[in-house]
Amino acid sequence: MTERMQSITAIYVPLDGMNAKGLVVADLTAGDDEETYQRTGKVNLTTTTAIRLLLDKAADVDEAVALLKQYDMNSSIGISHHLSIADAHGKSIVVEYVNGEMLVSETKVVTNHYLTDCEKRGVGSAQSRERYDTLAAYSGPAGAPQVRDMLESVAQKNYPKTDG
């Protein structure tokens, strides 16, 4: 795929983004390869199109959750997903789909393992949980230098490639 085509595609199939109201949405793998296929009779939506929908229509976390509840979620690329959603008011959540049910949990940190209170809580790599613990140890407001340090502390180069 050409670079131009990739750039155009990214507009319609984002994996993360922030809108003008300050809503931030990111798609992360959730820790296993169980795909989501909700079948409740609502309109179907894939994880990547959900991100576009939320960035276009939601101003905050509550609006994002209300929008997601209107659709049946379906995995985009054959893996489990969870959505990290935060807004300009400081509210942040993770949305996960387990056994066809949408689960929501407040959290300031999301890595690549399940976080909601369900039978899959904690499923994912040890590295994911270690990165989560490292980031969760930071507290309070963070300026650009602190955010840079936080991201540097959990950079892939700091972890063995054998444990996701």
Regions found by a protein language model. Name each.
Residues M1-K42, I79:
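A contiguous strand-loop segment
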Residues V13, D72, V98-E101, R129-T134:
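A general structural signal for short secondary-structure boundary/capping elements
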Residues D16, H81-D87, S92-I93:
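Short beta-strand scaffold segments in enzyme catalytic cores
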Residues D27-L28, E34-T36, I93-E96, L103-E106:
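Short helix/loop capping segments that flank catalytic or ligand/cofactor-binding pockets
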Residues T29, L68, D87-H89, E96-N99:
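Short, structured patches in soluble enzyme cores that scaffold and shape functional sites
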Residues G31-M73:
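Compact, glycine/acidic-enriched structural inserts
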Residues D62-L67, S76-I79, A88-G90, V110-G164:
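C-terminus-biased signal that marks the final domain/tail of proteins
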Residues V95-E119:
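A cross-kingdom feature marking charged/low-complexity
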